């Protein structure tokens, strides 16, 4: 059997490291099988792999099956034996997953911090867009709001879940109005962070909440180009990592 292992390796174009790996796996196989391949001996070999990790088991079985086919092809064996790997590699956990944010929809005292969080999670708005949002750009009766900046105008549908939180706000010039002026980004981050801490989500940030919006939209089946437009991005490049899984 050792002689045939050498011939098998010589027939393949392998790197030195791959050759060593094949040789090691096949020598172990030969120690258990001996000079004669039988179904019972193959079962013994399978049992010897029981405690190995799935990836290691898969590698060894692949090497042995290639070797068994080589033996059959060269008429060393009168039939082709094949070991079936019944185990599969565990599925990789997606890198980006939805987080349970149901707590954001519960009624609490800090309505402004809550609304900021919901505007990010439900519409994917950035902090800069939120502090510049005016009531004249919000049409509750049509369930739409308009985001206006120097380069582009976006019309976004207001989700039904978000409507009650907007309807309860006092209408002035800005959605978050500071005597007719917009608040600073620092004010927004302070309100948001205070609110998130109060609902035990201090690990979240404006960026992570926006990421949750992206993940949720992707899981709903929104195409990457449609999501690019919804977010007002110039290109889908920054979204590609979320669509790889």
UniProtKB/Swiss-Prot annotation:
GO cellular-component term (any): cytoplasm
- From which organism does this entry originate? Streptococcus mutans serotype c (strain ATCC 700610 / UA159)
Which named protein is this?
Tyrosine recombinase XerD-like
Q: What does this protein do?
A: Putative tyrosine recombinase. Not involved in the cutting and rejoining of the recombining DNA molecules on dif(SL) site.
Give the top-rank taxon of the lineage listed in the UniProt record for this protein.
Bacteria
Membrane-spanning regions, if any?
A: none
Active site (catalytic residues):
151, 210, 242
Instruction: From the Swiss-Prot or TrEMBL record, state where the protein is found.
Output: Cytoplasm
Q: Mainly localized where?
A: cytoplasm
Which UniProt keywords are present, listed alphabetically?
Answer: Cytoplasm, DNA integration, DNA recombination, DNA-binding
